[in-house]
UniProtKB/Swiss-Prot annotation:
Belongs to the somatotropin/prolactin family. The gene is Prl7a2. Keywords: Disulfide bond, Glycoprotein, Hormone, Secreted, Signal. It comes from the Eukaryota. Expression restricted to placental tissues. Trophoblast giant cells are found to be the major source. GO terms for molecular function: hormone activity; prolactin receptor binding. This is Prolactin-7A2. The keyword Secreted applies. InterPro entries: 4_helix_cytokine-like_core (IPR009079), Somatotropin/Prolactin (IPR001400), Somatotropin_CS (IPR018116). Glycans are attached at residues 26, 35, 102, 134. One of its GO terms (cellular component) is extracellular space.
Length: 250
């Protein structure tokens, strides 16, 4: 079976923020160094590029992980039922997303809301998500290893996701420390529902994996967007800013 997941394009209006980035509250009073050298900008760019590539790699692994689980652990009838619900039934998707660990971390829905975000809140917004998924991936791997007969390829992909999330978390901390300094008081909530993987009901098990996969992909896309916005704040004239504006106008 081939996994058919529509790629979400959430929060399009948030992209409009880039053209008004310097109008944000607290931007001018943030910890950014206005006298950064070319070397500093290259360092930032390298870290952002690596972090974004890692995030994209994780999303690719996530797709393959769910596909491998579906092929080896789920009946074709149940698979088709859930895929149709995720693709066609928005109420079902909303129900799934309200179960994500970070649903309380509100993402702006329009330009007015985005302009109200204090610039120095970005470390908390990003690290809260990253910490949650870093810990959740460890829990997922522990649970999968405890399930008798779990396919080796499923466990191997879960290991790869866990390793890359840990690496992405380290790069994210480095980026945010360079720009803002140390970040404290991160929201340490994790994804809920993984215990359903141990349930005897096949549908509960598969839904738990679908929910994990979908929420992880949405959060990683959000983090990638925040990386772009931060990169523009560090270097307003970067190609990233131009690409975001082009994406918004398309």
């Amino acid at each position: 079976m081939q996994l058919s997941f529509s790629r979400p394009r959430p929060w399009t209006l948030l992209l409009m923020v880039v053209s008004n980035l310097l109008l944000w509250e607290n931007v001018s009073s943030g910890n950014l160094n206005s006298n950064e050298t070319d070397g500093d900008l290259l360092l930032h760019r390298g870290l952002f590029d690596t972090a974004t590539r890692l995030s994209q790699d994780i999303r690719d692994l996530d797709i393959e992980f769910l596909r491998m689980y579906a092929v080896n652990e789920v009946s074709e009838k149940l698979y088709n039922k859930h895929m149709l619900e995720f693709i066609e039934d928005m109420d079902f998707v909303v129900k799934a997303l309200t179960c994500c660990h970070n649903y309380s971390i509100k993402t702006p829905e329009n330009l007015d809301e985005a302009q109200q975000i204090p610039f120095n809140d970005f470390p908390w917004l990003i690290l809260s998500r990253m910490w949650g998924w870093n810990e959740t991936s460890k829990n997922l791997l522990t649970i999968l290893r405890s399930i008798p007969g779990m396919h080796d390829d499923v466990i191997s992909l879960a290991q790869a996701i866990e390793r890359k999330l840990a690496e992405l978390f380290e790069y994210t901390q480095s980026i945010l420390t360079l720009i803002f300094g140390p970040t404290e008081n991160v929201d340490r909530s994790i994804f809920s529902g993984l215990e359903d993987l141990k349930a005897s009901d096949e549908e509960l098990r598969f839904f738990a994996l679908c929910k994990f996969s979908y929420c992880l992909r949405v959060d990683l896309q959000t983090i990638e967007l925040y990386f772009k916005l931060l990169q523009c704040a560090v270097n307003v004239n970067s190609n990233v800013c131009l690409s975001i504006n082009s994406e918004d106008s398309s």
